[in-house]
Amino acid sequence: MLILGSHVSLKGNDMFYGSVLEALEYNANTMMVYTGAPQNTIRKPIETMKIEEAHALMKEKGIDLNHVVVHAPYIINLCNPDPERRAFAVEFLTKEVIRVGQMGINQMVLHPGSAVGGNREEAVQWISEGLNQIIDNTKSYNVRIALETMAGKGNEIGKTFEEIKAIIDGVDDKSRVSVCFDTCHVHDAGYDVIHDLDKTLQLFDDIVGLNYISVVHVNDSKNELGASKDRHENIGFGYIGYDALLKVIYHEAFKEIPKILETPYVNDKPPYKLEIQMIKDRVFDNELKTKLEK
């Protein structure tokens, strides 16, 4: 079974229940949500999230809760050189992991962080130390933290497979960490998923281990290979291309894990229903953007 969905929003007063409704509108069987705004750390009380209603609807419609993903806010940086800011990041992510666990979700995607000042080895160490504290603070919640592969914009940590491995190596309880493989980021970081997907996956397996990949972000890229820009494009309309992304989506290595679209809106309209159908049909629709622009 193809496990495919997209980013969805918390919907007003419907909250998590509204997120499920949105995913169903796209004919998705999984989804990725934020527990609040991704640009800040303000969170509404967990009691307002309509979790029971969301779970009931997912069960009715055949969405496996084990395939649902949360994304942590972008602004959290576990490797900030300021000890107080690192402590805040640990404190907030501890609360976020608990919140994810209370929602019944078992994995949270996290951007590893940015090496402010440029010392990457020290940054990697701080990330591992922060993850150890978060995991130690949340032992009663079986939530994995999925480290996202990054494009390498600025001083982002996680551009190379070696950096992902180094972070994981520093984590004591490795059952609580995994990897989110982002196609746009990997491409922009310089790994060829167009012509050498199997070679790239073999390289990841040799360095980190394919068994660590627990979610795939499926995005095309507005930039050429190795650009380090991180600019997502709609499926088939970027430099990676439809055929290459289809190989990722249907690759045997990713058969049992969720594939999540994070492609840009077109004319303020979500493209996900059309993109999901195009992926299921296995035929590129070069009119997709035109349809959304009407």
Swiss-Prot record:
The keyword Oxidoreductase does not apply. Keywords: DNA damage, DNA repair, Endonuclease, Hydrolase, Metal-binding, Nuclease, Zinc. GO terms for molecular function: deoxyribonuclease IV (phage-T4-induced) activity; DNA binding; DNA-(apurinic or apyrimidinic site) endonuclease activity; phosphoric diester hydrolase activity; zinc ion binding. Zn(2+) 2 binds at E148, D182, H217, E262. It holds the Pfam family AP_endonuc_2. Zn(2+) 3 binds at H185, D230, H232. It catalyses: Endonucleolytic cleavage to 5'-phosphooligonucleotide end-products. Its cofactor is Zn(2+). Gene3D superfamilies: Divalent-metal-dependent TIM barrel enzymes. Zn(2+) 1 binds at H71, H111, E148. The keyword Nuclease applies. One of its GO terms (biological process) is base-excision repair. Its EC number is 3.1.21.2. Binds 3 Zn(2+) ions. It comes from the Bacteria. SUPFAM superfamilies: Xylose isomerase-like (SSF51658). Belongs to the AP endonuclease 2 family. Endonuclease IV plays a role in DNA repair. It cleaves phosphodiester bonds at apurinic or apyrimidinic (AP) sites, generating a 3'-hydroxyl group and a 5'-terminal sugar phosphate. PANTHER family: APURINIC-APYRIMIDINIC ENDONUCLEASE (PTHR21445:SF0), ENDONUCLEASE IV ENDODEOXYRIBONUCLEASE IV (PTHR21445). This is Probable endonuclease 4. It comes from Acholeplasma laidlawii (strain PG-8A).
